Amino acid sequence: MGTRDDEYDYLFKVVLIGDSGVGKSNLLSRFTRNEFNLESKSTIGVEFATRSIQVDGKTIKAQIWDTAGQERYRAITSAYYRGAVGALLVYDIAKHLTYENVERWLKELRDHADNNIVIMLVGNKSDLRHLRAVPTDEARAFAEKNNLSFIETSALDSTNVEEAFKNILTEIYRIVSQKQISDRSAHDESPGNNVVDISVPPTTDGQKSNKLQCCQNM
């Protein structure tokens, strides 16, 4: 099993961000190990876990990073964001303050992460319906306004946890594979090859190659 896990076509680093106590560690453990710990304390030390999924016949290995409790001190370092191609920005649907802080997290993410990082807004603890403090429509509207995807999850009862991670990984894969097609077509100048030409503006060519390399070589 371990050997199979080492075989993959793409490796994507995805970070979990958001206030302390919103359930980031349990989202991570639910997706990667199908575990949930009611007694879970704030994460201490750097923690990441991996899991591979299949998309279009390709093996995508996700390396998912948890904030290691640094968010309590507002001390997440730029190293945490380095190389990340995806981010799950998590709040607790039963605590409005964690949702209010989403804007600050989004700003920090955009200040430190790659410009093209794929971001998903995640309203966690959807099992606490009777305590809901953040209306779904309000969060969805915020996500649309800021070009984020959006989903509500429950790490406790597993609702939408698989979907959240698979959706963001699939979106990242689509972007990366499109760039590969664009790059190959733009650089293929050999006559007689039966390749559909996809025009890529010369000014962005170099940038595209660099970003792709970043994604592949994490």
UniProtKB/Swiss-Prot annotation:
Residues bearing a lipid moiety (S-geranylgeranyl cysteine): C214, C215
Superkingdom field: Eukaryota
Pfam families named among the record's database cross-references: Ras
Propeptide segments, given as residue ranges: 216-218
Topology with respect to the bilayer: Lipid-anchor
Chain location of the short sequence motif Switch 1 per the record: 36-47
Main localization category: membrane
InterPro entries linked: P-loop_NTPase (IPR027417), Rab_GTPases_membrane_traffic (IPR050209), Small_GTP-bd (IPR005225), Small_GTPase (IPR001806)
Protein name as annotated: Ras-related protein Rab-11B
